Amino acid sequence: MGLTGKTLFITGASRGIGLAIALRAARDGANIAIAAKTATPNPKLSGTIYTAAEEIERAGGKALPLVVDVRDEATVKGALDQTAQKFGGIDIVVNNASAISLTTVADTDMKRFDLMHQINARGTFVVSKWAIPYLEKVANPHILMISPPLFLDLITALPGH
């Protein structure tokens, strides 16, 4: 099954793995909702939802850049609504947005841990929950979960999970 005409709602699609997935789908002629927080350039982070949209359209897809913080339920619902209205539905959700901390458990402050939990667990749940009504309307729906890297050394383990 190709992706021509299929609609993907991808969180964290302004850079990295999310953008790579979007570009690959765009080459097949997919519609891509770029659901990410970065609307203005940041010297520490490459790409914005708008630069991603330009790349997607150059690759052959249709793009909808949306400013979305996956922690904000109303924003997520609104972005899903906009996506379905623009493209006629949603076929695939890619939960890719994440926060990580490249520190040990002992060195990770609780504020950072809470942020990771809010984005990686709650945000993924919120997007999936509110996407289901759209996914139920299509023949072959999918939800793809992308997880941040895990570190399994129990003494110096990273706290992401």
Could you say what each language-model-derived stretch is?
Residues 91-92:
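Short SAM/SAH-binding signature in class I
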Residues 136, 142-161:
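Catalytic loop of short-chain dehydrogenase/reductase
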Residues 128-129:
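A short, exposed helix-loop element centered on a Lys and neighboring polar residues
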Residues 10-11, 95-98, 141-148:
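Structural signature of the Rossmann-like NAD(P)-dependent dehydrogenase/reductase core
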